[in-house]
Amino acid sequence: FLPMLAGLAASMVPKLVCLITKKC
């Protein structure tokens, strides 16, 4: 459960940074 959650977070963070900073 925890490794899957960590993997999900790792995939979501770059997308959030991309949207927030507008640097894609």
From Swiss-Prot:
Primary localisation category: secreted
**Can you list the GO cellular component terms from the UniProt entry?**
extracellular region
The chain's coiled-coil residues are none
| Signal sequence annotation | none
Where is this gene product found?
A: Secreted
User: Alphabetically, which GO biological process terms does the record hold?
Assistant: defense response to bacterium
Reply yes or no: does the keyword Disulfide bond apply: yes
Q: Which domain of life is it from?
A: Eukaryota
A Pfam family it matches: Antimicrobial_1
Which cysteine pairs are covalently linked by disulfides here?
A: 18-24
Instruction: Give the record's keywords alphabetically.
Output: Amphibian defense peptide, Antibiotic, Antimicrobial, Disulfide bond, Secreted
Tissue and organ expression note: Expressed by the skin glands.
Q: What does this protein do?
A: Antibacterial activity against Gram-positive bacterium S.aureus and Gram-negative bacterium E.coli.
Which family is this sequence assigned to?
Answer: Belongs to the frog skin active peptide (FSAP) family. Brevinin subfamily.
Protein name according to UniProt: Brevinin-1La
